[in-house]
Amino acid sequence: MARKSLMVKASRKPKFSTRAYNRCPICGRPRAYLRKFGVCRICFRNMSLTGEMPGVRKSSW
């Protein structure tokens, strides 16, 4: 419940622009947010392994 309320709070426009922060829309995690994909690192990994992220593959060298 607390995480859901923080997700709603983060989506609102803040009084000052410096107070804005990103939060994962899937799990609500505030840290390790990947701007390019719009999710946190954990959700990014799960989505890329299941093939939900187009053009993303596990690296191998």
Swiss-Prot record:
Gene Ontology MF: a single term: rRNA binding
Family (UniProt): Belongs to the universal ribosomal protein uS14 family. Zinc-binding uS14 subfamily.
Keywords linked to the UniProt accession: Metal-binding, Ribonucleoprotein, Ribosomal protein, RNA-binding, rRNA-binding, Zinc
Cofactor detail note: Binds 1 zinc ion per subunit.
Name of the protein: Small ribosomal subunit protein uS14
Matching Gene3D superfamilies: 30s Ribosomal Protein S14, Chain N
Keyword Oxidoreductase (UniProt): no
Binding site for Zn(2+): C24, C27, C40, C43
Organism from which the protein derives: Solidesulfovibrio magneticus (strain ATCC 700980 / DSM 13731 / RS-1) (Desulfovibrio magneticus)
Keyword Metal-binding in record: yes
Organismal lineage: Bacteria, Pseudomonadati, Thermodesulfobacteriota, Desulfovibrionia, Desulfovibrionales
Requisite cofactors: Zn(2+)
